[in-house]
Regions:
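Alpha/beta-hydrolase active-site loop
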Residues: 81-99
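N-terminal cap/lid segment of alpha/beta-hydrolase-fold proteins
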Residues: 1-28, 395-397
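Short glycine-enriched nucleophile-adjacent loop
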Residues: 114-126
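Glycine/threonine-rich phosphate-binding loop and adjacent beta-strand/alpha-helix elements that clamp
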Residues: 5-10, 293-525
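Alpha/beta-hydrolase fold nucleophile elbow
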Residues: 101-113
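Short beta-strand/loop motif that positions the catalytic acidic residue
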Residues: 230, 236-238
Length: 525
């Protein structure tokens, strides 16, 4: 790899803006197929937090182009987020294909922001020959900033401040850069984040999304890939603990509806920590479509990592049981009292009162939204008296659960707004004090009528898990999940953010008569 060489080149766009790219070349004279990544974090980094270095891809026979998007890194212009990317992507693709070392074949890769830059372009733009978007989505609401109406507090503020720090560095605002950095390291950003974004990046995406999340008439944007692009060979990569997973599933469905044949891979990954083998899998896909000798793809359509058996499986949309929640009213004060009853059992009319104290909110652990994303043991959380817990009897035979856990529940509340934070877990057979959290979900209820009962639906993060004979299934419900989401103050005139004197103690009544836990299909189409 020592003989791999690189150079920087400029692309001047139609409006005169210059975009800077770093181009890594294999040994020899080419021409070669091109792998393109367009990203906002600096071409020197090249997403090496999750991807192999560009020199590795070049050593496999690819010309690798890492481009700084408009207004970032070494590129000119003003950074305006996703709105700029359709036009800039189209012009970049045309330029890349004109490079003398390019043999005319183009593949794209990258995750998160870099994932979306692969999917949006001007009408009429020829598509890449193959595309590997990872951990991304099209809806700026549901796939980029909010879940169940609640803003991704830790993630959204943290990412927004990263971009704000880059802006400060670009402007040589060293004081601002240090203030942002110190707030991130001290965790003060969880309390000061809104003000810092307003101060240092008021036109940024994160600040805009944060304000939209509390607006009564939000105008959210959803990006639309060209159907011709969705018909091309497409490998979509998701992680069970990644916040953009629902976005990846949405793109998969849209590609199917467009007439494409997308491949889907969901592994044991957070946004920044992937599994061994992810690089080789992507290389195999590129080789299958960009190198003549491997033209036939051997990929199955949907490959999923089983969270409990720790292995890869094909998707099987099998019918799963449903459960209802039962309690004699003590499911929060006694973590062994609440019961998950099979759907064949008769439902019981009962109520559990859950008190949310904003002074001591339930911390978010593990999952896809917290600051400790991944697998987690929530035993210590479930024994708290402000968490309502419902546990099944031991499973009688192996049970495979694939899909989107969805909880249907009626509630009322003594405040005008509140949150429901729900976790689904497995309690392994004969393992003491272990409650392995598999999935979480949230629903933010705003402007409700105090004391009026209403039906709620909480959709959790998708899963694939096999419960062995003797294992038990658990649902845990609380009124907070800090700092994955901001604290709901119980008053609509105040924002949901860090704990403050404006936050009220809130009593949430869970009415169990019509409660139901079911698993909806991973793919709806």
């Amino acid at each position: 790899m020592n003989s791999i060489r690189y150079r920087d080149e400029d692309l001047q766009l139609r409006d005169g803006t210059v975009l800077k790219s770093r181009i890594w070349s294999p040994q020899g004279n080419g021409p070669w197929p091109v792998l393109l990544m367009r990203q906002p974090y600096g071409r020197e980094i090249a997403s090496t937090i999750t991807y192999a270095h560009p020199s590795w891809w070049a050593s496999k026979g690819y010309l690798v182009v890492i481009q700084d998007v408009r207004g970032q890194g070494g590129s000119g212009g003003e950074f305006s987020g996703f709105n700029q990317e359709a036009s800039d992507t189209s012009q970049t693709h045309n330029w890349v294909r004109s490079l003398p070392e390019c043999n005319g074949l183009l593949g794209t890769y990258g995750f998160s922001y870099q994932g979306l830059t692969q999917l949006i372009a001007e009408e009429g733009t020829p598509p890449p020959d193959c595309i590997i978007p990872a951990m991304t989505g099209l809806s700026e609401d549901e796939h980029w900033s909010c879940e169940g109406g609640a803003f991704w507090w830790h993630l959204g503020i943290g990412w927004g401040l990263q971009l704000a720090a880059q802006k400060a560095q670009r402007e040589k605002n060293w004081k601002g850069w240090h203030e942002i950095r110190e707030n991130l390291e001290s965790k003060k950003y969880l309390y000061n984040g809104h003000d810092l974004l307003e101060k240092y990046d008021p036109e940024g995406m994160a600040y805009k999304w944060l304000n939209l999340s509390s607006s009564k008439t939000p105008q959210w944007k959803t990006h639309k890939p060209l159907s011709s692009w969705l018909k091309k060979p497409l490998l979509l990569i998701g992680g069970w603990w990644d916040p953009h997973l629902k976005g990846i599933l949405d793109i998969f469905e849209k590609a199917k509806k467009a007439g494409g044949n997308p491949k889907l891979l969901i592994g044991p990954a957070t946004h920044l920590q992937w599994w061994e083998g992810a690089q080789r899998t992507q290389l195999d896909f590129f080789d299958s479509h960009l190198k003549e000798k491997n033209k036939e793809s051997h990929f199955s359509q949907i490959n999923l990592w089983n969270l409990t058996t720790k292995g890869w499986e094909l998707s099987v949309q099998n019918k799963t049981p449903t459960w209802s929640l039962r309690s004699e009213g003590l499911a929060s004060i006694n973590h062994l009292e609440g019961f998950l009853a099979p759907n064949s059992d008769l439902e019981a009319d009962s109520e559990v009162n859950l008190v949310h104290d904003p002074w001591r909110p339930i911390p978010s652990i593990g999952g896809h939204l917290s600051d400790t994303a991944g697998e987690a043991n929530r035993y210590q959380l479930d024994i708290r008296p402000d968490v309502a817990v419902f546990t099944s009897d031991p499973i009688l035979k192996d049970l495979r659960l694939e899909g989107i856990p969805t909880l249907f529940l009626e509630t009322n509340c003594d405040r005008e707004c509140f949150d429901l934070f729900v976790a689904l877990s497995i309690i392994p057979k004969a393992v003491e004090n272990t409650v392995t959290q598999l999935s979480t979900g949230v629903l933010r209820i705003a402007n409700c009528d105090k004391g009026i009962t209403s039906a709620r639906e909480i959709r959790l993060q998708p899963i694939l898990a096999t419960f062995k004979k003797g294992d038990r299934l658990r649902i845990s419900i609380s009124g907070s999940g800090w700092p994955a989401i901001g604290i709901n103050p119980g008053q609509s005139k105040y924002l949901c953010e860090g704990p403050s004197p404006n936050c009220l103690v809130t009593t949430i009544s869970l009415l169990l008569l019509n409660s139901k836990l079911k698993f909806e299909s991973l793919i709806s189409s």
